[in-house]
Amino acid sequence: MLKTTLLFFMTALCEIVGCFLPWLWLKRGATAWLLVPAGVSLALFVWLLTLHPAASGRVYAAYGGVYVCTALLWLRFVDGVRLSLYDWSGALIALCGMLIIVAGWGRA
């Protein structure tokens, strides 16, 4: 379970970075060269999703829970926004959903 969660976390970071770099280019006028590492990051994101032993739809559903938590960590530490009780509650619910789905991988 820990290995799966860490792999999902790495996957989420790749997805967020791959989307954040073009955002910097479009919204903040950063160099278009950021699109190169963004493309690499998104390709790595896709590859990491293929490393899980479950059906793709089940992997995507479980990944969503970790993505929510990772995005909120990004909000806190990159964007500098303090998380609310609603943020923490939503993250906990999403993570519980992920844990339930992953726990059932071998039983489905």
From Swiss-Prot:
Main location: membrane
Keyword annotations: Cell inner membrane, Cell membrane, Membrane, Transmembrane, Transmembrane helix
Membrane topology: Multi-pass membrane protein
One GO term describing the cellular component: plasma membrane
InterPro entries attached to this UniProt entry: UPF0060
Transmembrane segments: 6-26, 29-49, 61-81, 85-105
Pfam families listed in its UniProt record: UPF0060
Highest taxon above the source species: Bacteria
Compartments (UniProt record): Cell inner membrane
Keyword Transmembrane in record: yes
Sequence similarity: Belongs to the UPF0060 family.
PANTHER family in the cross-refs: UPF0060 MEMBRANE PROTEIN YNFA
HAMAP family: UPF0060
Protein name: UPF0060 membrane protein CKO_01576
Organism: Citrobacter koseri (strain ATCC BAA-895 / CDC 4225-83 / SGSC4696)
